[in-house]
Amino acid sequence: MTVEQICQIGKVKISDENIAIINQYKDYIIPWLSSDEFKTNYAKKEFPPLINPAKLDYEGSNPAHAWVLNLPLPAFYDFLVFGSHAVGLHGAMIGFFALCGVTRKVMALRGGAAANLTAANLANASSQDNYERMFKEIISLNKLKQSGRIKHFYLQLSDLVLDDDTKKLYSLIDASSALHIVRDPISVLKGVAALPHRAELLKVEEDFVPFGMFLHQDPFAHFSKHIFYMNHGLTMNTDKQSGVGKGKEMDFLPDINSAEWWLLNYEQTFHDGIMYQLLAPSLKNIKLKQTTDFIGEKCFESMCELADHFGFERPKQSDRWLFEKRVSDLKHLTPMILYAHENSPLYTEQNSKAPEINKELVENSIKITLTTRFDGTLYILPELDISSLFELADPVFAVLIESQADALKLLKSPELLTKIKIYIKDLSHALLKQAKIENTKKLKENDVLAWFEKYPKMRQVMSFIMKQHLLLLRTHKPEIIEGYKYYQEFLKLSKDDEPLDLSSGLNGKSISVTNF
């Protein structure tokens, strides 16, 4: 069997690098491809493994080689979660899982998304990049799980990774134990079109550090300038310049016209049907829930149901009040870091001189984080929880110190601790105040329906996209679609519309359709 024949069986792209990898494992590949086990159980797979995955030592494996050899991602995660953006996967569910001992997740990231808060990670994330990163993260988290440091973790697929290797990536993901969360599509558009964003990075000299506050900055005035909304679309406001403010890509108020951008951005929204088809070969048992199952009093019982189904800890009765909270209210305001330097004046001190924000100030500051009880770090590193030292505006808040070294520095600086206590108290009140302000800016589903009434072409686009997005529900759970109050209103609005003509494009923009 030649290398070219092996590549043909595994659909491996011919390149010098891939050929070298195949040659390195050729003595294992040939007998495996000739075995009865391969012919019976694997030969019909679209991307069959080129060596026996059952005999693989994942911890000692090279992720780049594993990708070329079509080896499944290590299935050490407890379960898989998939769904669109704005169904709760990036806010509420992270917190609710953390309260049940599921404190970490691994995520696939669309092209252009950042794995970490560093400028170096702002490059495109291809299918192979995602595979290799997730491979490493799963191995790392499994070691923490085996050591007892964490109890459970999951794999989240809420970004759709689109490139030439999309089918391969998803075929190598085990989705045999899966949770799928769905929501009324009109509510999804309402959510993403009025989604507040907060600055994530702060430029200090030539470097970037996580965004945070300093003792001399008024918490009631400063960070409100760093909360903004995405306001760009393909047919409306296409000439906006990058930046924040009226007439730019970002603004301090949401714009219903951004619904168009989200509607057409199926890497993040409305890709449930595509994801369902991509994962279908390994999907065996889908636990289907709606966003509304995790709101108010229903949430606690829903999490008990998921705990029993997936085998993680049931929520504690003493935490029931937390499951009735709106996690999204503080999602984009926390965690908030306080850089506390002993020479910095408190913002309330009269006639004090504000220090220069530079590397020295940041590096020598004690880092205190105001977060919420939904932060998984509280349960993984409880020794960093110093909430009991503070008077907070709401019991949902919690306070973390970055390290034991910072804790020792704080114990030796009683004057600084006094300043920090005052600041954190005020900051918690400021965050609650800002959350209320942002809530007044929220759009409503009727705003989305009115927008669709104004733009018939967008109704045609929505109807076209929903054929794909609602595939699973239409096939297996049509009663859920029938229960979508606002989507049913959309159907009434669009009942006389002509089907979308793909050949005509969209206001000068070409339309392409990706099929799997």
Name every feature range the model reports, one short phrase each.
Residues 278-418, 424-426, 431-434, 438-444:
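The conserved 3'-phosphoadenosine-5'-phosphosulfate
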Residues 17-41, 46, 407-516:
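C-terminal non-catalytic accessory extensions
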Residues 3, 131, 220-223, 246-249, ...:
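Short amphipathic alpha-helical segments that mediate assembly, nucleic-acid/protein binding
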Residues 2-74:
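Non-catalytic propeptide/linker segments at domain boundaries
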Residues 110-151, 167-180, 199, 210-214, ...:
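C-terminal or late-domain output modules
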Residues 41-317, 331-350, 366-370:
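PAPS-dependent sulfotransferase catalytic domain
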